[in-house]
UniProtKB/Swiss-Prot annotation:
SUPFAM superfamilies: Glycerol-3-phosphate (1)-acyltransferase
GO MF annotations, alphabetized: 1-acylglycerol-3-phosphate O-acyltransferase activity
Protein name: 1-acyl-sn-glycerol-3-phosphate acyltransferase epsilon
Associated pathway: Phospholipid metabolism; CDP-diacylglycerol biosynthesis; CDP-diacylglycerol from sn-glycerol 3-phosphate: step 2/3
Biological source species: Mus musculus
UniProt record similarity statement: Belongs to the 1-acyl-sn-glycerol-3-phosphate acyltransferase family.
Superkingdom, taxonomy of origin: Eukaryota
Tissues of expression: Widely expressed.
Membrane topology: Multi-pass membrane protein
Catalysis performed (reactions): a 1-acyl-sn-glycero-3-phosphate + an acyl-CoA = a 1,2-diacyl-sn-glycero-3-phosphate + CoA; 1-(9Z-octadecenoyl)-sn-glycero-3-phosphate + tetradecanoyl-CoA = 1-(9Z)-octadecenoyl-2-tetradecanoyl-sn-glycero-3-phosphate + CoA; pentadecanoyl-CoA + 1-(9Z-octadecenoyl)-sn-glycero-3-phosphate = 1-(9Z)-octadecenoyl-2-pentadecanoyl-sn-glycero-3-phosphate + CoA; 1-(9Z-octadecenoyl)-sn-glycero-3-phosphate + octadecanoyl-CoA = 1-(9Z-octadecenoyl)-2-octadecanoyl-sn-glycero-3-phosphate + CoA
GO terms (BP aspect): acylglycerol metabolic process; CDP-diacylglycerol biosynthetic process; hematopoietic progenitor cell differentiation
SMART domains: PlsC
Places the protein is found: Endoplasmic reticulum membrane; Nucleus envelope; Mitochondrion
Domain remark from Swiss-Prot or TrEMBL: The HXXXXD motif is essential for acyltransferase activity and may constitute the binding site for the phosphate moiety of the glycerol-3-phosphate.
Gene: Agpat5
Length: 365
């Protein structure tokens, strides 16, 4: 009985972070809406600067729970620049935590507010979040023939013209890799083989459209491409097999003791501009990822297994940087919920904010 209670309590470790992260969303959206109204007649750069600061506050709260609260050990391989840069961030995609890994790296460059994502189109219907991500610079894209490159190009060029700092996160695989999804993996490998490309084992065949449009639209604005390969330690089983990477709730329940991040900075001038050449280049980058992952999971040498080649640095994010965000947003939300009018405003923001956000996407379409 006692053991069952302990196990149940352990499995509920995600509850507090979930309540605070989701519970503060209306508070955050109200703060952003107020700033949006006040800045209507101000220069666009001023609005963007403050919006980036607001975004940084919320994402620091996310990092408090996903780094400080979980106590995950982050091992960084490669030299992450200390200065801010305008970049496209390319990574393997296997977990819902992947977007937070991008936050982790950006925070170490003091560029957290500049992070913007290329997202699956269906995510725009997420209550409150879907609408706000678009306002912050996120781009929703559809797959294959439905991909609207003109819309993406137009939005990115508007940011370039405005001088907006960009830390654009793209997952070129388009969907999460999962070793148990054998049909998806087989289809991806067949797609590569039919086009004379190397067949990949631990990643899916990358798609070029979003990456090419992003690079082509922002090449005069970019400093580099960040090529990132991530492994969530704790899901390997040996012999090239591993279980599913942790979900966000599993990660918050501390089911990932170590996070291995291999970082490679590629100067903008080293990236081919023509689409077919870039397609080959991108696949070659994923071949490198695949070799890194094969070495990590399948190396015959036990000393080389469960780590990337080269030296790693144990990177820590100070709680002094993240805890203030928890206190600020948590306190503002608590104050709002203390009064009847505040509770009505809070619930109204959840309801009408979601409906108006969906309506905005419908009208925009």
């Amino acid at each position: 009985m006692l053991l069952s209670l302990v196990l149940h309590t352990y499995s509920m470790r995600y509850l507090l972070p979930s309540v605070l992260l989701l519970g503060s969303a209306p508070t955050y959206l109200l703060a952003w809406t107020l700033w949006r109204v006040l800045s209507a007649l101000m220069p666009a750069r001023l609005y963007q600067r403050v919006d980036d600061r607001l975004y940084c506050v919320y994402q620091n709260m996310v990092l408090f729970f996903f780094e400080n609260y979980t106590g995950v050990q982050i091992l960084l391989y490669g030299d992450l620049p200390k200065n801010k840069e305008n970049v496209i961030y390319l990574a393997n995609h296997q977990s819902t935590v992947d977007w937070i890994v991008a936050d982790m790296l950006a925070a170490r460059q003091d560029a957290l507010g500049h992070v913007r994502y290329v997202l699956k189109d269906k995510l725009k219907w997420l209550p409150l979040y879907g609408f706000y991500f678009a306002q912050h610079g996120g781009i929703y894209v559809k797959r294959s023939a439905k991909f609207n490159d003109k819309e993406m190009r137009s939005k990115l060029q508007s940011y370039v013209n405005a001088g907006t700092p960009m830390y654009l996160v793209i997952f070129p695989e388009g969907t999460r890799y999962n070793a148990t999804y054998t049909k998806l993996l087989s289809a991806s490998q067949a797609f590569a083989a039919q086009r004379g490309l190397a067949v990949l084992k631990h990643v899916l065949t990358p798609r070029i459209k979003a990456t090419h449009v992003a690079f082509d639209s922002m090449k005069s604005h970019l400093d580099a491409i960040y090529d990132v390969t991530v492994v969530y330690e704790g899901n390997e089983k040996g012999s090239g097999k591993y279980s599913n990477p942790p979900s966000m709730t599993e990660f918050l329940c501390k089911q990932c003791p170590k996070l291995h991040i291999h970082f490679d900075r590629i100067d903008r001038n080293e990236v081919p501009e023509e689409q077919e050449h870039m397609k080959k280049w991108l696949h070659e980058r994923f071949e490198i990822k695949d070799r890194l992952l094969i070495e990590f999971y399948d190396s015959p040498d036990p000393e080389r297994r469960n780590k990337f080649p080269g030296k790693s640095v144990h990177s820590r994010l100070s709680v002094k940087k993240t805890l203030p965000s928890v206190l600020i947003l948590g306190s503002l939300t608590a104050v709002m919920l203390m009064t009847e009018s505040g509770r009505k405003l809070y619930m109204g923001t959840w309801l009408y904010g979601t409906l108006l956000g969906c309506l905005w996407f419908v009208i925009k379409a």
